[in-house]
């Protein structure tokens, strides 16, 4: 065993220890912990930095030819079902450790400034450290049971972080939605794990892969059962990586603090699903039906995420749907056997998307003092525009991330996405067509986000009353604003916002509250660049966004087959990569189609949203009325599809939420009136029967009590019934009354 492998357990232990210490301090000594909260944040960051330092050393040992390493200890000794706990280190593990720790450290540095005015500052770092520790534990897990446990811990932390501002109803609902949706996937994952154990007799990833290969070779397995277990296992990644149809939680997860959005959507929670598919790729690749299922789910998710992002006005939600689409690309690549391209895109996308989310947080942080602390305002791209002039560093770094997601060389995502597009087209023209069309949509909506946010004129001042007739993009250019209807035609109105003070309204609950600590004085009419601790992570993330993709470029891999990560990332690749025949000319020729598609999407976006756009405000002007009606209907359909989330949330609400409530009410009524009615009826009849048996049991005392009770009751009735005496003739009075 290599000496350094024996210290791998320190990697998840450091952030776990930080979360435990801060949690105990917050619980036992809240006053002192609050006073020393900056020290608490520094401690969390330093401990995670220790993990970040160890991870590259494991990485270097792997690329220098060290074998994979597995250490395990007996957890529950049992002769039939022995359970072990340990860690497994291979190239996939080492590179994921670097990804999680580097992004995690930068998010912590960023959060120190972003969350500085929040009353839950220390609590945030407790959750953040535990979240990172859970993800690191998942990456190092050596068996399926351990993976399942750490996945549940990741889900619990995401519940806490998405609902961090739990006094806001939207945040409380969002964390519940994410938790319940992931429980559906995790239930399928649990069934799949049990089914795989039944087939192979092992939970250890290395052992079950070998046993499954032997069973396949000897025809000792029922393929229907194996595919069923594999699809059930895949339900876990479907939920965690927000794949269709369990993707509905992802945009609502934007209710959490923006640094958490960066961590969830870049390196941790959503990456956990792709990581599990990669870890179990030995198992999946032997089942063509399951691989086809994975590829189609990925393709549908990629296309759906791109279409849902087209008309989003919320900055973070647009990036969330972008994440959903890119994760679909990764699943598509996994399904067609392009394992290397999928993991390559996972890495390049993680750094690019972390940069974009942290950049959006910088924008939101600067917009809040101007438009208010409501997410409907500070995240609304309709109130932004022209921010590059006021926030140049944020604007430039955000542009880097945008160009990377669009697939423009030499940025990171170009290299990985280009490989996925080429492999998908070679595998299936249908899947390839979906992937290429989605690439064009990606370039369009990412350019749209950048242009609406950073280019043009600053629109917030117009929206809060200084200028009420400022032009805004039309609805038919897929811009979402407040709409009214006039004579059957959809027209735009400028949002009527009331200027807010630079403190949050109480109705927004536990939002970052500058009133607890005086914020820096800002010009309330125009935003300013964020401070150093928020800018530093953006600059550092811009470096891998620009250069890390070139590590996987074919022309750079010649002569370095054992020293670059993407050549050894998987020892069992299902396709071979050409290295000798590819040169600059081949690379350019192969990349022309993807660059052309991305450029077309950017060009359309520039035409509609660019600062020099010459199109009329309403695209119907100057167009034939008959053609305009068709075009308007088409654009309205696209707008409604995007704005209403593809109607899937409404469908789920109608079928599952309302359906379950109706079913629950029906069952409650049946239980109350039928089941309880029968039980209560039997009880009442038993009560009266018992009383009757008591007074009819032959006891003299019981007979006397009954006789006296009856006579008294009869006498009372006779006296109260006055008409009885009036109907009796006078001659019979002496029978009733004695007269003197």
Swiss-Prot record:
One Pfam family of this chain: Proton_antipo_M
Catalyzed reaction equations: a plastoquinone + NADH + (n+1) H(+)(in) = a plastoquinol + NAD(+) + n H(+)(out); a plastoquinone + NADPH + (n+1) H(+)(in) = a plastoquinol + NADP(+) + n H(+)(out)
Membrane topology: Multi-pass membrane protein
Keywords: Chloroplast, Membrane, NAD, NADP, Plastid, Plastoquinone, Quinone, Thylakoid, Translocase, Transmembrane, Transmembrane helix, Transport
Single Gene Ontology BP annotation: electron transport coupled proton transport
Subcellular location: Plastid, Chloroplast thylakoid membrane
Function of the molecule: NDH shuttles electrons from NAD(P)H:plastoquinone, via FMN and iron-sulfur (Fe-S) centers, to quinones in the photosynthetic chain and possibly in a chloroplast respiratory chain. The immediate electron acceptor for the enzyme in this species is believed to be plastoquinone. Couples the redox reaction to proton translocation, and thus conserves the redox energy in a proton gradient.
Transmembrane segments: 9-29, 39-59, 87-107, 124-144, 147-167, 185-205, 219-239, 258-278, 291-311, 327-347, 354-374, 395-415, 425-445, 532-552, 584-604, 673-693, 705-725
Any one Gene Ontology molecular-function term assigned to this protein's record: quinone binding
Keyword match Plastid: yes
Enzyme class: translocase
Self-association state and partner proteins as the record states: NDH is composed of at least 16 different subunits, 5 of which are encoded in the nucleus.
Keyword Membrane included in the entry's annotation: yes
Protein name as annotated: NAD(P)H-quinone oxidoreductase subunit 5, chloroplastic
Organism placement in taxonomy: Eukaryota, Viridiplantae, Streptophyta, Embryophyta, Tracheophyta
Record-stated family: Belongs to the complex I subunit 5 family.
Documented EC number(s): 7.1.1.-
Entry GO terms, CC: chloroplast thylakoid membrane
Organism: Psilotum nudum (Whisk fern)
């Amino acid at each position: 065993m290599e000496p350094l492998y024996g210290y791998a357990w320190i990697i998840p232990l450091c952030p776990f220890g930080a979360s435990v210490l801060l949690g105990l301090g917050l619980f036992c000594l809240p006053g002192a912990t609050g006073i020393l909260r900056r020290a608490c944040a520094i401690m969390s960051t330093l401990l995670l930095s220790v993990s970040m330092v160890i991870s590259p050393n494991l990485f270097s040992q792997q690329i220098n030819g060290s074998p994979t390493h597995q250490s395990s200890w007996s957890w529950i000794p049992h002769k039939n079902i022995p359970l072990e706990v340990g860690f497994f280190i291979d190239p996939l593990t080492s590179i994921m450790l670097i990804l999680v720790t580097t992004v995690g450290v930068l998010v912590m540095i960023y959060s120190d400034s972003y969350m500085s005015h929040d009353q839950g500052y220390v609590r945030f770092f407790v959750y953040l450290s535990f979240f990172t520790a859970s993800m690191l534990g998942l990456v190092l897990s050596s068996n399926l049971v351990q993976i399942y446990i750490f996945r549940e811990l990741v889900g619990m932390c995401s519940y806490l972080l998405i609902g961090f501002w739990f006094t806001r109803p939207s945040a409380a609902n969002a964390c519940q939605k994410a938790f319940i949706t992931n429980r559906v996937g995790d239930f399928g994952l649990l069934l799949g794990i049990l089914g795989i154990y039944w087939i192979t007799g092992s939970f250890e990833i290395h052992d079950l892969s070998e046993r499954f290969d032997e069973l396949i070779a000897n025809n000792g397995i029922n393929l229907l059962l194996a595919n069923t277990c594999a699809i059930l296992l895949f339900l876990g990644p479907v939920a965690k990586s927000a794949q269709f149809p369990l993707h509905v939680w992802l945009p609502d997860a934007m209710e959490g603090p923006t640094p958490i959005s960066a961590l969830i959507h870049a390196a941790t929670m959503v990456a956990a699903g792709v990581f599990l598919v990669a870890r179990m790729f030995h198992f999946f690749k032997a089942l063509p039906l399951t691989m086809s299922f994975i590829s189609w789910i990925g393709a549908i998710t990629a296309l759906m995420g791109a279409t849902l992002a087209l008309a989003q006005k919320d900055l973070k939600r647009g990036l969330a749907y972008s994440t959903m689409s890119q994760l679909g690309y990764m699943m598509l690549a996994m399904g067609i056997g392009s394992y290397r391209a999928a993991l390559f895109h996972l890495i390049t996308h993680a750094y690019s998307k972390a940069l974009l989310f942290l950049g959006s947080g910088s924008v939101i942080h600067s917009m809040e003092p101007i438009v208010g602390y409501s997410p409907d305002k500070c995240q609304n791209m309709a109130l932004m525009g022209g921010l590059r002039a006021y926030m140049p560093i944020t604007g430039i770094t955000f542009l880097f991330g945008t160009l990377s997601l669009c697939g423009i060389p030499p940025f990171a995502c170009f290299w990985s996405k280009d490989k996925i597009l080429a492999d998908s087209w070679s595998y299936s023209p249908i899947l390839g067509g979906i992937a290429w069309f989605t690439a064009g949509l990606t370039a369009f909506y990412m350019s749209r986000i950048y242009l609406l946010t950073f280019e043009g004129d600053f629109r917030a001042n117009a929206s809060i009353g200084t200028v009420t007739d400022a032009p805004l993009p039309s609805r038919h250019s897929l811009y979402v604003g407040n709409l009214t209807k006039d004579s059957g035609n959809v027209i735009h109105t400028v949002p009527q916002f009331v200027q807010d003070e630079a403190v949050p309204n109480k109705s927004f609950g536990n939002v970052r509250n500058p009133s607890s600590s005086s914020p820096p004085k800002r010009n309330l009419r125009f935003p300013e660049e964020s401070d150093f601790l928020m800018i530093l992570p953006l600059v550092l993330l811009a470096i891998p966004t620009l250069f890390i993709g070139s590590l996987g470029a074919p022309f750079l891999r010649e002569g370095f087959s054992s020293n670059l990560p993407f050549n050894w990332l998987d020892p069992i690749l299902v396709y071979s990569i050409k290295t000798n025949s590819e040169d600059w000319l081949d690379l350019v020729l192969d990349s022309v189609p993807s660059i052309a598609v991305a450029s077309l999407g950017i060009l359309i976006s520039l035409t509609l949203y660019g600062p020099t756009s010459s199109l009329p405000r309403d695209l119907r002007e100057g167009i034939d009325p008959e053609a305009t009606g068709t075009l308007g209907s088409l654009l309205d359909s696209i707008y409604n599809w995007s704005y209403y989330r593809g109607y899937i949330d409404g469908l789920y609400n109608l079928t599952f939420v309302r359906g379950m409530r109706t079913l629950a009410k029906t069952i409650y009524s049946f239980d109350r009136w039928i089941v309880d009615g029968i039980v209560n009826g039997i009880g009442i009849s038993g009560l009266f029967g018992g009383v009757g048996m008591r007074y009819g049991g032959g006891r003299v005392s019981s007979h006397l009590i009954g006789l006296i009770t009856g006579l008294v009751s009869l006498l009372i009735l006779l006296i109260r019934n006055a008409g009885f005496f009036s109907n009796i003739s006078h001659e019979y009075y002496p029978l009733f009354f004695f007269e003197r």
